[in-house]
Amino acid sequence: MRMESLADRLDACQEKLLDLYEKDSNKLEDQILHWHYVRLENAMLFKARQAGLTRVGHQMVPTLSVTKGKAHKAIEVHLSLQGLQTSAYAHEPWTLQTTSLEMWNTQPQRCWKKKGRRLTVKFDGEDHKAVEYVSWGYIYVQSTETDLWYKVPGKVSYKGLYYEMEGQEHYYVTFAQEAQKYGETGKWEVHMGNTVIYEPCASVSSTQDAVREVSTAETAGHLRDNTTQTTTTPTCVGPTQTSTSVQTPPHKRQRLHRDREQQPDTTQKDNHKRVDSTDQWINGHRNSTETGDNCDSYSSPVIHLKGDPNKLKCFRYRLQHSVPELFDKASSTWHWAGGQSTTRAAFVTLWYVNVEQRKQFLNRVTIPKGIQATAGYMSMCI
């Protein structure tokens, strides 16, 4: 009779759970009721196993340790939701999924999370070492001191995933620890949509720690636009200096001026197509019969980066430490020191071994917002 009574009570409890599953409510009071019955179900199974029963009706009774562990978890979640019901967030939508045990145990543990979005961390900057994580839009945390509930936004930095509460940062995923498992160099990149967070540059203001990136497709389009508009004559420019300020001797500036006068307008040409050529320079001047991007054997494909000096320095630092194999040389930050240019913008020039290397660079690297990139060719006889 005792076993039959226990079986009836267990059946009634499980019927209530089925009703709640079918209801699929988004109200917190229904989720509290759900966990009340889960708690009751596990308590009955625990008592049955404690009494030596291995079956109640048609249901097998798990081991004592399993039923005890499930009962404790159900009590923990049930009490948490009861506390949440007294907060200002009780009338928000709460579903079976958002109040599940899996959600409770997901990092950050012992709190509730909503609006998760995936991000990818590329350890050592390599695609095959990419690991996905979830950054939460909102995290509901109960203060251990006051028992009050706080709704705080989830945040992402180069260091990891965290939230701030009562003036303190709480990291629940630390990428440095993850790098020990998935990487070798101790470096990584955080990719979140069109945003990429690189390693902060110590020599640059902290405001540059996280730079919003533009997608590769947008970067390529931007490069094409800039090349057409700003490099109407992608000439093989003479040697450039790598000091902070580029100052060319007067006679060399005159030579460059003569070279440009002898080149035809190439605004209607494909500025990205390079044709191999032999001796295109005659007595120090470029052969005027050559058109487009036909440069002499000393020319190399380059990209000129234009923008704020600090941002350029930081970006160059990141490139040198994350993808040094994707370019040949990088200049120091330089400025125009003469002529009619009044801009205060700085430049960094990247040299490439060949066009294919530059293409690989553009396919893998996104140009930060605020930095303008222009492709072209420069003489490398230095």
From Swiss-Prot:
This is Regulatory protein E2. Phosphorylated. Sumoylation plays a regulatory role in E2 transcriptional activity. One of its GO terms (molecular function) is nucleotide binding. Residues 278-294 have a biased composition (Polar residues). The keyword Ion transport does not apply. The gene is E2. Residues 213-294 are annotated as: Disordered. It holds the Pfam family PPV_E2_N. Residues 1-204 are annotated as: Transactivation domain. It is found in: Host nucleus. It comes from the Viruses. It comes from Human papillomavirus type 61. Binds DNA as homodimer. Interacts with protein E1; this interaction greatly increases E1 DNA-binding activity. Interacts with protein L1; this interaction enhances E2-dependent replication and transcription activation. Interacts with protein L2; this interaction inhibits E2 transcriptional activity but not DNA replication function E2. Interacts with protein E7; this interaction inhibits E7 oncogenic activity. Interacts with host TAF1; this interaction modulates E2-dependent transcriptional regulation. Interacts with host BRD4; this interaction mediates E2 transcriptional activation function.
